[in-house]
Amino acid sequence: MVLASVTCTAPVNIAVIKYWGKRDENIILPLNSSLSGTLHQDDLKTTTTIVASEDYTEDELYLNGKKEDINAVRYQNVLKMIRSRATKLMDKKHCVHIASINNFPTAAGLASSASGYCCLVFTLAQMYGVDGDISGIARLGSGSACRSMYGGFVKWEMGTKDDGSDSIAVQVQPESHWPDMNIIVLVVNDKKKETSSTDGMQKSAATSVMMKERCAVTVPNRMRDIEEAINKKDFQTFGDITMKDSDDFHEVCATTTPPIYYLNDTSRYIMNLIHRYNKLSGSIKCAYTFDAGPNACIYLPAESTTEVLSLFMKHFPGDDMQTYYRGPKENIPSIENFVPSEKLASLYTPDTTFVNSLKYILHTKVGPGPQILSESESLIDNTTGLPKQLN
């Protein structure tokens, strides 16, 4: 007999102040605080259904239709913590089946672990009636997952306590505060990265000469300044800090022993193009940030989007705009027909070396945190206990 069924969604977030390095690997406590923007779930999200039933004999987990090992340490840490704080379904004998899907390809290199663990924890919390902060539980699955617990702009406070109780996410401003903040993601064609984020963090923390000053001085100052910029909707300061922190993060990786390089030639071409565009424009009109991979995430105000998208389309043209440009389709005519100003004309002569360097261009905006869906949107067949896509 089914005792409860809950379906929720959770967003991806893109950090502008990077999290890199842990002071505790087991409960995922970071060496520095970080800050991110939450991307809108109309474009990127994880959906998770959890069903509790007297008929289930064990907990089961399915990701994108494939059964996963739910006994993995991070899943178990999350389940144990949620169940220890339960106010509903207190009988521990009841097992759950979990089905989770992403509406974006994992191969895109976007942070699916953040939305995935956030969605898992948020959905479990609804089912078990967990009160209070749950971002610290999401952190046990994936550090950056705690920042997906809220919409808008979110900081993950590193905390100082050994038990991690003060290492939680806090909303800086909701998505309604800066509604014209847009994000463009340039998804780069690239092979699987050679060094995972987990391994990279450990090596950088142990060997990079930049880590000490970054954690003690650079990041605390930037956290203060970028939070103030967000509060004031000061894009010049926001953009400047965002690009500098991305550059510093990749310099930390480059000064790691052995050096780690997540960016490729396409990434560097994009960085140079954005700096040239901002210089000719006379102000910062868009700002790049790169995580541990070659994809460019670009923050920009709504007023700059058509101009910037037309520039990217010129340098990285797609065969079919309907599939290549993953954003509001009504924007396509204005992007295709955009005529640059005379002072920007020199930018519209692309290096043909990079013409086929992108898989696609995603255009979204800052959006809300996790959402609860109706029973009709469940991913699990209550009769079989399996994901509907497997029936």
Curated annotation (Swiss-Prot):
Metabolic or biological pathway: Steroid biosynthesis; cholesterol biosynthesis
Xref: InterPro entries: GHMP_kinase_C_sf, Mev_decarb, Mev_diP_decarb, MVD-like_N, Mvd1_C, Ribosomal_Su5_D2-typ_SF, Ribsml_uS5_D2-typ_fold_subgr
Main function: Catalyzes the ATP dependent decarboxylation of (R)-5-diphosphomevalonate to form isopentenyl diphosphate (IPP). Functions in the mevalonate (MVA) pathway leading to isopentenyl diphosphate (IPP), a key precursor for the biosynthesis of isoprenoids and sterol synthesis.
E.C. code: 4.1.1.33
Oligomer and partners: Homodimer.
Localization per record: Cytoplasm
Gene Ontology biological process: cholesterol biosynthetic process; isopentenyl diphosphate biosynthetic process, mevalonate pathway
Protein's UniProt name: Diphosphomevalonate decarboxylase
Gene Ontology molecular functions: ATP binding; diphosphomevalonate decarboxylase activity
Similarity comment text for this entry: Belongs to the diphosphomevalonate decarboxylase family.
Keyword vocabulary terms for this entry: ATP-binding, Cholesterol biosynthesis, Cholesterol metabolism, Cytoplasm, Lipid biosynthesis, Lipid metabolism, Lyase, Nucleotide-binding, Steroid biosynthesis, Steroid metabolism, Sterol biosynthesis, Sterol metabolism
Annotated (R)-5-diphosphomevalonate binding sites: Y19, W20, G21, K22, R74, S142, G143, S144, A145, C146, R147, T198
GO cellular-component term (any): cytosol
Organism, as annotated: Dictyostelium discoideum
